[in-house]
């Protein structure tokens, strides 16, 4: 039974303990983000990240053509290569893939996205963000069957061969659904979904699938997308989703043991 593990790319995440924990295992897929590296490279190239908040409260990056180029350079370049190299140092044969490779992540370009600006709802223009429609597991199964560990990150591709930026948590959910994964771990730089973001001890421990909408108000900023990803994974047949920390030893084992916020 394939395990899908998404490793956060924001500041404060620790990659080493995750890879240490995964190295002895087999039959898993790693999905990565890389927001910290995207922001760093964007600043260096003179293309700082732009964000907007939708009327529903979800905060997203605006993927202008310049930003999309930065995403490709940062994620498919540095972040992914770093993960594959670190796996190699642990004796693991990993293969880096973007969602474009082999049509792995098929997406639809977002049209008519709206943003709240100074209390007004405005249309977002010049945005190359996408919504994932499905993941094709064929290439992943081929690699897994040959003993390789797939390491996957954005961007994705549309039916018209356009490259679009997609959310890595929701990409992980789509991959978990496509593979029929039993578990999806969304590992991040906090202990889980917090009732009070200022209180690290206020972790929501368990969420039933019919309770997700009710706890969404607690999910601020990027955490909201993780909760949405958890909901999408459950709806697609994944048995359990855990939002847990990368911090400390054995983060994968602890996540599988239920540390963090468990959705089922």
Residue ranges of each PLM-predicted region?
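C-terminal catalytic "cap/lid" subdomain
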Residues: 1-264
């Amino acid at each position: 039974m394939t395990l899908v593990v998404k490793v956060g790319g924001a500041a404060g995440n620790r990659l080493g303990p995750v890879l240490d924990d995964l190295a002895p295992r087999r039959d898993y897929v790693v999905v990565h983000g890389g927001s910290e590296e995207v922001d760093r490279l964007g600043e260096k190239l003179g293309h700082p990240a732009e964000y907007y908040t939708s009327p529903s409260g979800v905060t997203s990056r605006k993927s202008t053509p310049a930003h999309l180029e930065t995403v490709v350079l940062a994620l498919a370049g540095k972040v992914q290569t770093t993960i594959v190299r670190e796996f190699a140092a642990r004796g693991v044969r990993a293969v880096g893939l973007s969602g474009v490779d082999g049509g792995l992540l098929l997406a639809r370009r977002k049209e008519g996205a709206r943003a709240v600006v100074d209390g007004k709802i405005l249309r977002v223009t010049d945005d190359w963000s996408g919504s994932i429609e499905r993941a094709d597991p064929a290439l992943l199964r081929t690699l897994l069957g040959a003993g390789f560990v797939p390491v996957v990150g954005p961007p994705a591709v549309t039916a018209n061969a356009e490259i679009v930026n997609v959310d890595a948590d929701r990409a992980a959910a789509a991959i978990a659904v496509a593979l029929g994964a039993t578990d999806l771990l969304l590992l991040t730089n906090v202990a889980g979904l917090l009732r009070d973001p200022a209180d690290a001890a206020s972790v929501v421990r368990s969420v039933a699938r019919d309770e997700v909408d009710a706890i969404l108000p607690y999910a601020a900023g990027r955490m909201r997308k993780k909760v949405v990803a958890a909901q999408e994974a459950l709806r697609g047949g994944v048995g359990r989703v855990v939002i847990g920390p990368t911090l400390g030893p054995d983060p994968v084992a602890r996540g599988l043991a239920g540390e963090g916020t468990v959705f089922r």
